[in-house]
Structures are given as structure tokens and as C-alpha cells.
């Protein structure tokens, strides 16, 4: 049995220039450098191993042979009592469009359910990422601002857990407008604009749609609060000191966010963010760290002997 199987076939296509292929290759190189038995799997078949490494996860509905393979791998590893390591996008992607850092976890991708091996982390990784991405220091909580920003996300993926995003948007606007007269700015996801639903909520007083060319950073400028379902884009708002509201307990910002819209107009909670930020940064790794085998070493104690 292999120690590690790296599932290149968890991708829809395998191309040398593909960033995800580069990440998988770096992981494989690091494990091989430690003397582990590694299989680089490019076929649509399940291979016995202690740790199956793949890009992404599966949602409630899925199609495509590579997604079916992911599902088969997850079921096989669970049945055998072994582990899956899904690789997920960076929570700092607003400052990291090239995905220099991505996230690693065990047996699932939901931040408050699965193992990221990042509890009570030191500030070291945050300082490393902040320097590499040229991020400013975390700003004090903002106690001024005007509009409420609602950020939408792609529907149908594993993050949404089957939630109807159109319904969520309409209900969220209704709840906010029932207690607040602040302007509401809707920021659609570029890959899922939801034109009909956005048009529907634009019928409420002082509800506006973000212009297509506007960045998240620009839409957060002057915001009083920002509302998300569970998108990792909420991290950008937290770092800027903007109070955040989320609807799902598996949002990466859940521990430092509000969940009850009833206080959004006047009195959002402003919790301490320092340890949360250190822990979040600690589940991100670079390709160079992969090549050194640091991710395997970090998670080794969490794997079945």
C-alpha cells in the first residue's frame, strides 16, 4: 500500500502550466524527498493508500468523471479508515490571484468541522504570508461607514451545501431593510451574476448593484458592514476592520463574525481577531513548503498509524 496517492486525475484535465497541477506536483516531490511511497495517479481509478491527496471536494450534486473519482476516493478512504487531504483555495485570494498559498485539511473542507492542524497557532505563518503578499496589518474595527455590502458567491459548489442562493439574497435584503435604512450594495459573483434575482432586490429602496469593474476592495470602501453566506471573501472585510455577518457556521470567519442581522444597523459585535487570524494563516502553505515535505510532517501526527 502506498503512503500517499496524489490524484492528478481529480482535475478535469492535466496540463503542465496549470497551477493546480503544479501544486500537486510540489506535494508529490516533497513526499518523495522524505522517502515515502508515493503514487502519482493520472488515471480514473482508486488506489489503496494511507493519504489520498486531491484538488477540491464534492458537492451534493456533481458531474464529470473527475468529480465522480473524487467521490469514489472519499468513500474508499473512509471505508478503509484512511484519510483524504483536499486542497482548497486561499482565504487571501483577494491579495493572491496567483494562488501562491492554498489550504490543506484532512477528511473535509468545512473549516469548523474538519482538521486543519492549526489550533492555537503562532503568528509566524501570518507574518510570512503578510510579507509575501504585501498585506497591510490588520486594521482596527471600523465604527463608521455608510452602506451595507452583500457579497454573492457561486452556487452549486460544496460550500453552498445545497442552499438556494437566490432565496438567501432576497431574504437577506428583506431582513436588513426591515430594520435599517442604510444603502445596500449588492456585489454579484463574476461567474454567477444572478441577474434576475439581483434585479428583483433592486426594487427595494436604496438597494444598488456594484458596477462590473469594481473590485472587492473598492466595494468595501466606506462600508458599515459586509454580509456573506459563507464566502472566504469575508476575510478581506475582517482584515479591513469591517464588521462581517455570515449565515453558515462553516464560514472561515464564523468565530469573528456576527450571525444575527438584528444588530446590523447600530451595534455589530466586534470580537478579538488576533488568534483567529494566526490559526487561519496556519492552514495555508506554499509550493516551496510542499517541496520540503513540511505539509506531510505537519499533518503526520493526525494520520492513522
Give the ranges of each region predicted by the language model.
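N-terminal pre-catalytic "stem/leader" segment of glycosyltransferase-like enzymes
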Residues: 1-51, 55, 157, 301-305
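Short loop/turn segments at strand-loop or loop-helix junctions that form parts
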Residues: 6-11, 55-58, 87-91, 145-157, ...
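Short, charged/polar "capping" segments at the starts of alpha-helices
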Residues: 13-19, 61-63, 158-159, 192-199
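Well-ordered, non-membrane alpha-helical segments in soluble/globular domains
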Residues: 20-27, 64-72, 164-175
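Extended catalytic core of nucleotide-activated donor transferases of GT-like folds
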Residues: 25, 34-98
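Leloir-type glycosyltransferase catalytic cores
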Residues: 97-145, 254-305
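Catalytic donor nucleotide-activated moiety binding site of glycosyltransferases and closely related
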Residues: 170-212
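A donor-sugar binding/catalytic signature common to diverse glycosyltransferases
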Residues: 213-258
